[in-house]
Amino acid sequence: LDENSLFLDEGKNLLIEEFGKEYATYFSILSLISSSRTSRREIESVLQKNIGGYLERLENEYHLITRIKPILAKPASRNQKYVLEDNFLNFWFRFIYKYRSTIEIGNFNYVKKVIKRDFSTFAGKFLEKMFIHFLASSNKYTDIGSYWERGNQNEIDIVAINKETKKVLLAEVKLRPEKLNTRILPVKARKLFSLLKDYEFEFKGFSL
């Protein structure tokens, strides 16, 4: 990462023309989502404005974000998050756009330190996707997703359910195996125990 890096302005070049004069608001929303401020309430509390229209366009017109709900959520549930699907844009908004003022004054060492510090947490989300795809391709489960309660409480990275065998796999995903703590999963899953009373639960940790 230095002043000659080609991708410093890549995200901006890709989207600024598309978004037009309101690009700053769109960029702020995408930067917050990439930094795990994923609910409408969280984003609006930072930006201090109604962003319903922006989210709708980002999802349905620009196809940059996707709205997701926790596994087993009812169709009418308002407990939902937004995720930025493109891996490059996720990185760019998380580490380049967010620290653009630091980059503008040439303090690349600071940004490198931030990337080194936060990358394992950032990459963990992509690792989650990989393991979800792996479990889905095994054809052992009827439902697979993530779980969380309101306010992003009791987050469980992967919940895989087999309705036929009445078995549930709960998994924590970390980039580094030493960071795994599967003992917390039964505590986070208390509501799931009541929703899936007759099911057998298994707890695992996935890492590289």
Residue ranges of predicted features:
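A cross-kingdom feature that marks ATP-driven nucleic-acid transaction machinery
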Residues: R78-L208
